[in-house]
Amino acid sequence: MEEINLYLDDAKDSMQKAIKHTELELSKIRAGKASPNMFDGIMVDYYGSSTPLAQVATVSVPEPRSITIKAYEKSMVTTIEKAIRDANMGFNPQNDGDVIRINVPPLTEERRRDLVKQTKAEGESGKVRIRKIRQETNDELKKLLKDGASEDEVKRAEEVVQALTNDTSAKLEALIAAKEKELMTV
């Protein structure tokens, strides 16, 4: 039935988006080495409006444990420095007037454990999104029974949704395990 395929495609797309979202969130968790992605969530006050750091400066990694941030406008350097300090990322930015330099300290064992907890929480959030998508799709499929779809078709579609859920959950588990390994590798 055409409608069933639409619901299955929609569920697949939504689950892929949930994976992508979790990947993005996990990329923001720093693993001891410098990465421009670490600053994706930082918002800077740009003439009264909250603007992502990437839109007001370039973030580069000249060495594995250092980051340089060059503002597009010189007047923004102190504002960017303040935004980084306010983000409580554990960095001590040095402002030399033109460029902000940040040395990325190695992670302590305690900080690594905290980041693993954060990773697990993000992973659990992704799993909840996937289960919610499964539930919504199954609810829509059950409504089709009232609209004249056969029980066999709906049952098969529910099995496909469950297989899709299992597959997506396995991908999510692999992402989480890889991030945990990355965090705990000294």
Swiss-Prot record:
<dbReference type="InterPro" id="IPR023584">
    <property type="entry name" value="Ribosome_recyc_fac_dom"/>
</dbReference>
<dbReference type="Pfam" id="PF01765">
    <property type="entry name" value="RRF"/>
</dbReference>
<dbReference type="GO" id="GO:0043023">
    <property type="term" value="F:ribosomal large subunit binding"/>
</dbReference>
<dbReference type="GO" id="GO:0006415">
    <property type="term" value="P:translational termination"/>
</dbReference>
<comment type="similarity">
    <text>Belongs to the RRF family.</text>
</comment>
<keyword id="KW-0648">Protein biosynthesis</keyword>
<dbReference type="GO" id="GO:0005737">
    <property type="term" value="C:cytoplasm"/>
</dbReference>
<protein>
    <recommendedName>
        <fullName>Ribosome-recycling factor</fullName>
    </recommendedName>
</protein>
<comment type="function">
    <text>Responsible for the release of ribosomes from messenger RNA at the termination of protein biosynthesis. May increase the efficiency of translation by recycling ribosomes from one round of translation to another.</text>
</comment>
<dbReference type="InterPro" id="IPR036191">
    <property type="entry name" value="RRF_sf"/>
</dbReference>
<keyword id="KW-0963">Cytoplasm</keyword>
<dbReference type="InterPro" id="IPR002661">
    <property type="entry name" value="Ribosome_recyc_fac"/>
</dbReference>
